[in-house]
Amino acid sequence: MNENKPKTNHRLKLGLISLISMALAFVLYPTYSAYKTAQNEYNEMLRLQEEAYNQIVEDEYITLDGLPTIHVIPGNSLKIGDVQKYMDLFVRTQPDVILSNCRMIHICEPKNFMDIAIADGVDVTAGGQGTAYAYASSDDFSITLQIDVDEDYGQKSAVSHELSHIFDFACGSGYGDYGISDGAQLQSLYKNYTDCVGAYGATDSAEFFAQAGAMYVNDPENLKSVCMDLYNFMDSLYHLY
């Protein structure tokens, strides 16, 4: 037997579904629109940040709060973001007891560092123990650094080492003179524990002191383990722990 079933309920359901869909679209559209607006604004912010990061430093001298004057050695093309990142990671993290004696930070690209160091009369072989990464000058109480933020091969420790040289200079009787590393107490420690801070530190008493300073700042427990007398000596000067 054939029955003609009413189609009213089916049509009603379709109508309700359509109305619900339209209502949802009406309700959700502002939310989606706000999301897209926020996403676009965020992407624009990232673009501007990247653009600012990649801008090349145009000034030869830079002033950053809490740091010595920064000198961009002429002939070097450095990104503003790289300089700020390097300073935040490896220089601002230095204790004030050694950073405060530094009067100038010269910076350059890694590819130019060797030529600059050689022109300044630096032994770029690091006393035959490797390759120089940075150096300090008693002429103007400055340090020279190569700005490399892509790799971490001990830059913070290297900066501590050079700042320890500056600390040593500051305790001398005048420009060009070492102070602490020429003193009787450090000379005795160097004589008795020459190799305790590594081969480079063994080259002379000035490097011995600078290596001990870097180790005291960055790896105090290791310095304690290799030479407690040297740790106590550095602690009497830097007073960090």
Model regions and ranges:
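Generic early N-terminus positional signal peaking at residue ~5-7
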Residues: 5-6, 157
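Short, hydrophobic/aliphatic alpha-helical segments
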Residues: 2-4, 196
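A metal-dependent hydrolase signature that marks the N-terminal structural subdomain at the beginning
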Residues: 2, 9-18, 26-135, 139-141
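Active-site-flanking segments in enzyme catalytic domains
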Residues: 68-80, 99-241
